[in-house]
Amino acid sequence: MPIPRTIIEQIKRIIPPLDGSLHKGQSGRVGVLGGALDYTGAPFFAAFSALRFGVDLSHVICAPTAAGAIKSYSPDLIVHPILNESSSVDKVKSELQSLLSRLHVLVVGPGLGREPYMQSYARLAISLVRERGMYLVLDADALFLVGHDLSIIKGYRRAVLTPNVVEFKRLSEQVGVDPDAPPDERAGVVSRMLGGVTVLQKGAKDIISVDTTGEEADLSASHIEGADAEKEKIKETIAVDVEGGLKRCGGQGDVLSGCVGTFMAWGKCYESGVYGDGTVPTSRVPLLAAVAGSMVTRTTSRRAYAKSGRSLITQDLLSEAGPAFEECFGGDKGRL
């Protein structure tokens, strides 16, 4: 099923121009919170793929036990080893506040793990993001955190959740979705019950849904100003069945998180008037970012699989990110 033309046109509007008018940082600054002793690849893939998809700066906020490995993977990443188990909450909070002031979006979850201290820091970061009205992507063990306390994310319409099959089943049960509900409608139900967050349900085809008709959807708590509350009550589902690769390997979901984060960072730059015509509403950005991220990541996977076949690993996707972006959106009117 083709993506509606209006969606594609809106996505292209939030992509920064490559015309020499912007300085460093105005094409997106992404942060990834995750990375502990056992998990160093996931935050790298999320943060580095954001660079490959076109952001200017990419930061990793991690535990000290992960920092050395992540730094060694690429000199292009800015690594902050502040999630120290022995640090005081006040110290970490102060450091997070300083870092968040420099970012357009925070991706929480890749390599986060389930250690209590990492989960606690993720909860803290999410609360600070909400206070600042930043865009937010939640994946992997950040979804585990949400499942244990739905209030962490409920009503925050600047967020995108990216569950895989297992994570979506668990999340559906936790919010109370009827197990007999049609499969293609469940993501919309989860969105409504979580107050209008955008849900990107990964699968053979990706289902992106947003439903802001429930009572929990909150424009003011989402820092969406000047919008008509009635017009903002929407139900929308987009199925993305762009061809992807046939090999599944650990890390591809992290690439998706980085790509969605890229488009959300651009959405923030667009919202702030750094470039663009201002015709795309702020409330559209999470849906557009999820659709665009799905399209580009699936295309990246297809291109990498065509070269590597059964031997494909996630690193193979990174060199295909730029060409995949061009294939999906590239070239016209001075844009990426």
Curated annotation (Swiss-Prot):
One of its GO terms (cellular component) is cytoplasm. Residues 7-328 form the YjeF C-terminal domain. It holds the Pfam family Carb_kinase. It comes from the Eukaryota. Its cofactor is Mg(2+). ATP binds at residues 202-206, 244-253. One of its GO terms (biological process) is metabolite repair. PANTHER family: ATP-DEPENDENT (S)-NAD(P)H-HYDRATE DEHYDRATASE, ATP-DEPENDENT (S)-NAD(P)H-HYDRATE DEHYDRATASE FAMILY MEMBER. Catalyzes the dehydration of the S-form of NAD(P)HX at the expense of ATP, which is converted to ADP. Together with NAD(P)HX epimerase, which catalyzes the epimerization of the S- and R-forms, the enzyme allows the repair of both epimers of NAD(P)HX, a damaged form of NAD(P)H that is a result of enzymatic or heat-dependent hydration. This is ATP-dependent (S)-NAD(P)H-hydrate dehydratase. The lineage of its organism: Eukaryota, Fungi, Dikarya, Basidiomycota, Agaricomycotina.
